[in-house]
Amino acid sequence: LCEKFKVQRLVELNCVD
């Protein structure tokens, strides 16, 4: 979900799929 969380800058924490 990197793209979805990328906006919230949580790509590092929630970058699973």
Curated annotation (Swiss-Prot):
Provide one Gene Ontology cellular component.
Answer: extracellular region
The record's subcellular locations are:
Secreted
Main location group = secreted
The record's tissue-specificity note reads: Expressed by the venom gland.
From the Swiss-Prot or TrEMBL record, what is one GO molecular function term? toxin activity
Q: Which domain of life is it from?
A: Eukaryota
Signal peptide (UniProt feature, chain positions): none
Keywords assigned? Secreted, Toxin
Does the keyword field hold Cytoplasm?
Answer: no
Summary of the function given for this chain in its UniProt record: Shows moderate insect toxicity coupled with mild effect on mice.
Q: What is this protein called?
A: Toxin Plt
